[in-house]
């Protein structure tokens, strides 16, 4: 007879889970009892925050929930930052944790790893937090924590299993999976949206992360409407090198002008949040004349004044609109998009343009790569203006929750989800030091990741912000390690280059020939502050 812990692993496998990230501990041993026989791959990070970020990167690339196994108390607290990032970016993630015995909960007796209320803490970032208290709970609790991955706006969920429950015999009936329904689109609302768009003279599409898997249909709709497509950070790549594409932040004045001049705006799968639409913290959002908004989350639809809110999946809505709209609508979309691109690129200034050129050099050296970023200067520049050549292949932690240390472990998760695709991680020397130990995980798993370290000797973005605010610069110059020595200690091939044109591409191409994980240090000049 199996234990409840073993049964949980088996039921995760039945739900399509094929990889978990975790560091075993005495409070999760029962989960590991069934893991070897399950066929699920286990990846051991060097810190539980890394487990969460790996699960995030895995989920973004695979489209399946990333799963982390963590111990009671510190294991879960270490994972909360990654859960916060996943919550901000609507990434499906399940964190399974231990917890002390049922009879001890809430009594504060000082047990190992004890917290006053672990689920209450998890709920600050998790969409759902549940506890399995008996064998009969297991299947319905799994249904509940998986529901958001299938039926609404995804995010992190949490399931805890007390020590005594995990080891108890599993005697429940064979589980049946309950699949939550995706909200059905309203045919009447689709018809209304099609009519508004058909009458438009200057339509525009705002594309968010909800369209990542619908690139072909989105391009068809944009071409039919003659509508420029402004892409948020999580939608980059869906309109690569397309005349209607505007791969620039809607926080830029040039893009805001384009939006304001559009008589109908169709927002697809975007939360219209300030980390995309007000990056400069002006306290204002782009001016919109008439807004049609499609979102899978009813709560999101209530947050902005919308002429026509449509509850449903963005990809399904695109298909429905393509079917409902006959003929071409506007003829000037490509000209409007081209002007916005030119003006936006001019607006970001010479320093940011140079960083964008470096990103284009990386893209040209390794076409079709998945590019994962930490909060680093090239990533900030790319979030302002960068066109990637792979849908869903540009993502980072510089927006939303904005957690440093994301890039290295998230790239590992991405590489595990797409083992035949090159993965490039871009991290600053400051952010990289949050998660350098995870390099050994990439080495151990033999993953084809090139880690680019943008070394400007400190937190240059913060130092600049301090100067702009009239504050003396303090605490922004942590001494970076010798990255050549770091690479050698991890057994990683190492290259060093500077920012002169061609240098990064040459190092990247050499790294691709070498195969496996590698480290490239880009010696950037610190900005004068």
What are these regions (language model features)?
Residues 268, 294, 373, 428-429, ...:
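Active-site flanking residues adjacent to catalytic metal/cofactor-binding acidic residues
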Residues 47, 107, 111-112, 180-192, ...:
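A general structural motif
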Residues 124-131, 176, 336-349, 490-492:
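Short glycine/proline- and acidic residue-enriched helix-loop micro-motifs
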Residues 136, 172, 287-375, 496-529:
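Phosphate/pyrophosphate-binding active-site segments
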Residues 104, 108-113, 259, 301-302, ...:
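Thiamine diphosphate
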Residues 1-325, 361, 441, 448-451:
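N-terminal alpha/beta PP-like core and its mobile active-site loop of ThDP/TPP-dependent enzymes
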Residues 5-8, 13, 23-36, 337-418:
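Active-site diphosphate/adenylate-binding microenvironment
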């Amino acid at each position: 007879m199996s234990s409840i812990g073993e049964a949980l692993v088996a039921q995760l496998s039945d739900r399509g889970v094929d990889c978990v990230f975790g560091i075993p501990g005495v409070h999760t041993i029962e989960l590991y009892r069934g893991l070897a026989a399950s066929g699920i791959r286990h990846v051991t990070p060097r810190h539980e925050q890394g487990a969460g970020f790996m699960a995030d990167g895995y989920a973004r690339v695979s489209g399946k929930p990333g799963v982390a196994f963590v111990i009671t108390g510190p294991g879960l607290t270490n994972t909360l930052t990654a859960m916060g990032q996943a919550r901000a970016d609507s990434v499906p993630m399940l964190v399974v944790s231990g917890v002390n015995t049922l009879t001890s909960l809430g009594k504060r007796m000082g047990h190992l790893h004890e917290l006053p209320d672990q689920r209450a803490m998890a709920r600050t970032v998790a969409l759902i937090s549940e506890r399995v208290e008996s064998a009969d709970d297991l299947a319905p609790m799994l249904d509940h924590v998986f529901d958001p991955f299938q039926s609404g706006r995804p995010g992190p969920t949490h399931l805890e299993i007390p020590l005594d429950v995990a080891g108890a015999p599993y005697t429940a009936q064979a589980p049946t999976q309950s699949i939550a329904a995706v909200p059905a689109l309203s045919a009447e609302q689709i018809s209304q949206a099609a009519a508004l768009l058909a009458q438009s003279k200057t339509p525009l599409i705002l594309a968010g992360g909800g369209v990542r898997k619908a690139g072909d249909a989105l391009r068809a709709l944009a071409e039919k409407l003659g509508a420029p497509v402004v892409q948020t950070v999580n939608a980059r790549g869906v309109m690569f090198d397309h005349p209607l594409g505007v791969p620039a932040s809607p926080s830029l004045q040039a893009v805001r002008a384009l939006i304001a001049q559009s008589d109908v705006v169709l927002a697809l799968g975007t939360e219209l949040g300030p980390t995309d639409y007000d990056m400069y913290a002006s306290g204002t959002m782009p001016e919109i004349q008439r807004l049609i908004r499609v979102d899978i989350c009813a709560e999101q639809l209530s947050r902005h004044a919308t002429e026509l809110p449509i509850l449903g999946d963005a990809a399904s809505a695109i298909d429905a609109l393509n079917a409902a709209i006959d003929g071409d609508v506007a003829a000037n979309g490509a000209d409007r998009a081209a002007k916005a691109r030119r003006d936006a690129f001019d607006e970001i200034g010479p320093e940011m343009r140079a960083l964008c050129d470096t990103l284009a050099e990386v893209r040209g050296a390794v076409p079709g790569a998945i590019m994962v970023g930490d909060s680093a200067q090239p990533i900030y520049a790319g979030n302002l203006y960068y066109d990637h050549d792979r849908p869903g292949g540009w993502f980072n932690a510089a927006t939303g929750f904005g957690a440093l240390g994301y890039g290295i472990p998230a790239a590992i998760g991405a590489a595990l989800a797409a083992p035949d695709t090159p993965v490039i991680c871009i991290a600053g020397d400051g952010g990289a030091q949050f998660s350098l130990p995870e390099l050994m995980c990439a080495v151990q798993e033999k993953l084809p990741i090139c880690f680019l370290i943008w070394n400007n000797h400190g937190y240059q973005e913060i130092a600049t912000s301090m100067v702009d605010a009239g504050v003396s610069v303090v605490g922004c110059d942590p001494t970076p390690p010798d990255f050549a020595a770091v690479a050698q200690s991890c057994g990683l091939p190492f290259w060093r280059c500077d920012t002169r044109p061609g240098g990064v591409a040459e190092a990247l191409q050499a790294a691709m020939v070498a195969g496996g994980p590698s480290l490239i240090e880009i010696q950037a000049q610190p900005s004068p502050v």
